[in-house]
């Protein structure tokens, strides 16, 4: 009888599978100790870390003296990097038991490491001692350290840097070119890395357990300039930037006259108006429309200001709450205040729609020509500091952007905004949209869209006196050559910074750890490829803050499952990996309170192993001094989130132990240096440097390995990959991503030693090789189930098997507030301890006789509770999981 017929018989013998509804949620928090039981995989970590030699890169892979190495890491942030000694010992043991073999020390430089020092220039020795002891304990438990040099230190008057609130957050981008900031970065690196750890008795420069050093997190001149955060730099920083720009131009052109000749080619004055009723002199008619949905509550009116008065603006919208904050900069596209208009449109938003972009104000019906410039101008203000968005896009399917998509920072004062953009394609029916209006009051006036607006070198601007201004991201009104020159200037300035810091660390300080600059998508790939390894970050539905950044009362997440979006974050990460270089993802998470978040780490562990990545880090383990809570504390910390922790043995098995095989074929997207520069000239953004922009669909990564090739053969062409339907099967046959049922996607892993299911059940049975999985009724019709053979080569041989099964997990008292669509929030009502969990009813059928199997529910520490019965399906053992056991993990012992 064929294997297929055997399974049919087994399934029929089990009738419809488990039908029991999930009982009430029960408390379950993975214990903070590290007993030697089946859930403790610390034996997989060689001890001490670094005993097998320094990590290095050979043929694009992390290796030590014994062979290839992978990193399954996590992050500690702020004060969590400086625990007391007893806590350092406990956390090191707990991380090791979970299979975590590297800790990224993040946000140390914000305030924590300076301790009692009068400024952020001198490390507090007491803090350094705590860090030293933690790193020592991590090393003893087989855990490497990744040291981040600059994350969130923000210089102020105490360090001799004025105008902090008018500079970019944490001085990012600015620190790529401001000379004294660069010198102070070097001082900090020298002070930290050359000191001798009294517990390991080695300086960090020579410590093999210090595996990685990252120069600056999510920091790049390209990115920060692209966000408009350098548009309104105060002096002396603006002068420094302008002088460096003029020096670069002098080196290229030699004289103002040659510069003028090059830049004035293609200048285009403003043409005829394309919009109607942009001054709101007529009543709202067909020209302007406000898009709403059934949830949207907003009021729109045209107002006229009395003579000599700017027009009254309510302090806040009726029925809304606002938080006032200091306004320090007019924001993108706004060089200064504007005269108050006589007539303006007032939009009072009381409730956003089912999607975050509603309500939105739209005017459509005009045509754009590809590669032609257009200039949008308007005046705008709000009842308090708020953000809005403006875009130019198709007024028809597929609703694609046409060259303009910008955030607008609003204050209570009228500000002029100007955006010059180049149309990305011809379109006969385009539209301008004002959108992302959170609850509040907004006023808009003098809206104009005209072709042209491109200028060359203006009269009075000269290289001899450094008077050629820096190009503002919000005012891309210069000629093609001028824009390209500025992008090339950013490239050269960034390259000199990153490569200069790298040489300082390697040559002057003698750092033996692997050094990375920052993350891809912030900085160009060819620049970051000049360092030791490539790094990236990604989040599935990062929390969004419609108003003030990190406002604990005003945020939402999309409560959606990745399994329903093939590729998602994972294929995009694959599309930025650089062929021939070690690749890590040092931040990844599916943030709370997404109810499907348990899928995140098992999926990226399997996918990363298939893609042959070198390191993956959860973000984060802990952000504070409370290392052992019994509640989920926020979006990111996993320390008390059982849905993420109980699957860690499976993650470590798939990624660290290598249970998931690498792809058999690697697909390369060719991106030469010239091609990357050309894409930056076109888009001005490093976010667009990925395989999908260079002829290879990122979904290829669900079938094969994927990387970008920075040194392609001149004749290289994008490979032809056959399109698949709704089922994506890896070329190894081990990973299946199935979206054949709309809204009912699932992801499975089938290897000899690890099995995984995550997704929607829909009454289906899931064969995982020789193991069969049936899942009963759960609250979301969704679950994540992992199985790991700890000792044996398979599930039919003697040894222990760890099983984890998770469904809904939440704090006691936490209630999601729906905001429309899939958007949800808790505001600041995260609930209280303990974490409450759903017991998943399921049957697991093993390919061994029942008499050979013992089955144990496990307690919060992973210790055995009284044995549960093992049922039979023919000659096969059936493990019955369920809420009656009040646990998320189990142990099966297969006897000889």
Language-model segments: which ranges?
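Proteolytic-maturation and junctional protease-sensitive modules
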Residues: 510, 840-881
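Active-site mouth of glycoside hydrolases
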Residues: 48-273, 396-412, 418, 422-503, ...
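Catalytic-core region of carbohydrate-active enzymes that cleave or remodel glycosidic bonds
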Residues: 194, 496-516, 523-541, 556-722, ...
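Long, low-hydrophobicity ectodomains and other hydrophilic envelope-associated domains
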Residues: 652-653, 657-848, 853-857
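Bacterial N-terminal signal peptides
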Residues: 6-17
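Extracellular and organelle-lumenal recognition/adhesion modules and their flexible linkers in secreted
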Residues: 266-469
């Amino acid at each position: 009888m064929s294997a297929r017929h055997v399974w049919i018989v087994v399934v029929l013998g089990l009738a419809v599978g488990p039908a029991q509804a999930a009982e009430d949620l029960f408390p379950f928090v993975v214990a903070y100790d590290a007993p030697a039981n089946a859930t403790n995989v610390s034996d997989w970590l060689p001890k001490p870390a670094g005993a097998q030699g320094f990590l290095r890169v050979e043929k694009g892979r992390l290796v030590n003296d014994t062979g290839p190495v992978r990193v399954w890491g996590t992050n500690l942030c702020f004060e969590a990097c400086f625990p007391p000694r007893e806590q350092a010992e406990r956390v090191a043991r707990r991380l090791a038991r979970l299979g975590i073999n590297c800790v990224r020390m993040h946000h140390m430089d914000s305030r924590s490491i300076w301790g009692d020092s009068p400024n952020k220039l001198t490390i507090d020795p007491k803090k350094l001692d705590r860090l030293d002891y933690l790193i020592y304990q991590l090393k003893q438990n087989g855990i490497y350290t990744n040291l981040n040099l600059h994350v969130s230190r923000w210089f102020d008057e105490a360090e001799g840097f004025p105008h902090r609130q008018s500079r970019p957050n944490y001085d990012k981008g600015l620190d790529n070119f401001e000379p004294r900031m660069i010198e102070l970065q070097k001082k900090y690196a020298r002070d930290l890395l050359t000191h001798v750890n009294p517990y390991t008795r080695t300086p960090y420069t020579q410590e093999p357990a210090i595996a990685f050093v990252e120069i600056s997190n999510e920091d790049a001149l390209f990115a920060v300039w692209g966000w408009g955060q350098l548009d309104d730099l105060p002096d002396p920083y603006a002068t420094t930037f302008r002088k460096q720009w003029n020096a670069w131009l002098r080196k290229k052109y030699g004289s103002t006259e040659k510069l003028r000749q090059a830049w004035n080619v293609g200048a285009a004055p403003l043409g005829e108006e394309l919009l109607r009723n942009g001054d709101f002199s007529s009543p709202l008619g067909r020209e302007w429309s406000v898009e709403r949905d059934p949830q949207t509550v907003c009021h729109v009116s045209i107002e006229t200001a009395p003579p000599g008065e700017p027009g009254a603006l309510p302090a806040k919208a009726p029925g809304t709450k606002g938080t006032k904050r200091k306004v320090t900069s007019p924001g993108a596209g706004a060089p200064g205040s504007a005269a108050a208009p006589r007539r303006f449109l007032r939009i009072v938003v009381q409730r956003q729609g089912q999607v975050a972009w509603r309500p939105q104000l739209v005017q459509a019906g005009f045509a754009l020509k590809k590669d032609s410039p257009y200039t949008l101008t308007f005046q705008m203000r709000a009842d308090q500091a708020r953000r809005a968005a403006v875009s130019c896009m198709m007024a028809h399917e597929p609703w694609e952007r046409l060259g303009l998509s910008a955030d607008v920072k609003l204050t209570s004062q009228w500000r002029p905004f100007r955006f010059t953009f180049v149309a990305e394609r011809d379109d006969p029916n385009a539209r301008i949209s004002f959108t992302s209006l959170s609850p509040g009051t907004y006023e808009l006036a003098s809206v104009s869209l005209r072709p042209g607006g491109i200028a060359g070198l203006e009269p009075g601007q000269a290289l001899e006196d450094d008077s050629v201004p820096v190009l503002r991201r919000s005012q891309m009104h210069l000629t093609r050559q001028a824009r390209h020159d500025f992008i090339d200037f950013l490239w050269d300035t960034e390259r000199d910074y990153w490569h200069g810091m790298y040489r300082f660390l390697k040559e002057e300080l003698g750092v033996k750890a692997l050094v990375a600059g920052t993350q891809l998508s912030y900085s160009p790939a060819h620049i970051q490829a000049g360092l030791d390894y490539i790094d990236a970050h990604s989040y599935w539905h990062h929390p969004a803050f419609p108003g003030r950044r990190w406002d604990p009362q005003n945020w939402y997440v999309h409560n959606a499952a990745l399994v329903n979006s093939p590729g998602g974050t994972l294929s995009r990460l694959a599309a930025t990996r650089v062929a021939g270089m070690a690749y890590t993802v040092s931040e990844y998470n599916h943030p709370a309170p997404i109810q499907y978040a348990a899928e995140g780490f098992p999926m990226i562990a399997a996918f990363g192993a298939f893609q042959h990545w070198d390191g993956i880090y959860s973000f984060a383990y802990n952000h504070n001094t409370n290392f052992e809570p019994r509640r989920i504390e926020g979006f990111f910390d996993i320390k008390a989130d059982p849905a993420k922790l109980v699957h860690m043995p499976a993650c470590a098995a798939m990624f660290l132990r290598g249970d998931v095989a690498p792809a058999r074929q690697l697909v390369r997207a060719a991106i030469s240096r010239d091609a990357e520069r050309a894409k930056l000239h076109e888009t001005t953004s490093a976010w667009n440097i990925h395989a999908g922009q260079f002829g290879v669909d990122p979904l290829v990564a669900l079938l094969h390995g994927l990387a970008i090739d920075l040194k392609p053969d001149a004749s290289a062409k994008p490979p032809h990959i056959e399109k698949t339907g709704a089922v994506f099967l890896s070329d190894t046959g081990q990973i299946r991503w199935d979206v054949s049922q709309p809204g009912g996607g699932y992801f499975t892993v089938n290897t000899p030693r690890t099995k995984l299911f995550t997704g929607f059940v829909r009454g289906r049975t899931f064969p995982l090789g020789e193991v069969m999985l049936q899942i009963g009724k759960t609250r979301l019709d969704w679950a994540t189930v992992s199985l790991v053979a700890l000792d044996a080569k398979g599930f039919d041989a003697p040894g222990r098997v760890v099983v984890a099964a998770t469904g809904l997990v939440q704090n006691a008292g936490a209630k999601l507030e729906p905001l429309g669509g899939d958007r949800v929030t808790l505001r600041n009502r995260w609930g209280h301890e303990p974490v409450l969990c759903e017991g998943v009813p399921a049957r697991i059928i093993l390919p061994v006789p029942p008499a050979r199997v013992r089955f144990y529910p496990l307690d919060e520490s992973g210790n055995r509770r009284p044995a549960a019965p093992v049922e039979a399906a023919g000659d096969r053992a059936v493990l019955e999981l369920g809420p009656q056991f009040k646990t998320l993990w189990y142990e099966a012992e297969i006897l000889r």
